[in-house]
Amino acid sequence: MIDTNIVLDLLLFKDPATQAFKQALASAKIQWLSTQAMRDELERVLGYPKIMARMAVAEMGADKVLQQFDTQALLVDVAPKASVTCRDPDDQKFIDLAVLHKATLLSKDRAVLCMKKRLLALSVRAQTAMDFEP
């Protein structure tokens, strides 16, 4: 699983830190789980002026980013609230889904990464894209 910032790094910014995730996804070693709420958040963020400017430079519209999301992410049902709570309410949906599926969660959000130990106790690895190994 990847949060919205990592989605942007993967699909728009082509950040080299996401390369291992991209390769694992392409080779079907992993599956990218997401929800409609996560897709909706991405769509909203793509409307931010700074992101729109980056899309213009990359000659990529929001529709193209969303199309890539739709072809790579598997939409699943929203997860119930996990037993751990993130300081940032916007990140809770990622925590909940990762806990339900005992998944690796890639993020660069401090509010998520500071939960590493608590999440590991629930069989969830929270880490940066740079640290990802399939």
Segments (PLM) and residue ranges:
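Short, well-structured N-terminal submotif of metal-dependent ribonuclease cores
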Residues: 1-34
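Alpha-helix capping/helix-boundary segments
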Residues: 6-7, 38, 111-112
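Short, flexible loop segments at the rims of nucleotide/cofactor-binding pockets, characterized by
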Residues: 8-10, 55, 80-87
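Residues that scaffold the ATP/ADP-binding catalytic core of kinase and kinase-like folds
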Residues: 9-11, 45, 54, 115-116
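Residues at secondary-structure transition points
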Residues: 16, 33, 60, 85, ...
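Short amphipathic alpha-helical segments and helix-helix/interface helices
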Residues: 21-22, 66, 94-95
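PIN-domain endoribonuclease scaffold, especially VapC-family toxins
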Residues: 24-29, 33-81
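Acidic, PIN/NYN-like endoribonuclease modules and their adjacent C-terminal/linker elements
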Residues: 85, 92-95, 99-106, 110-134
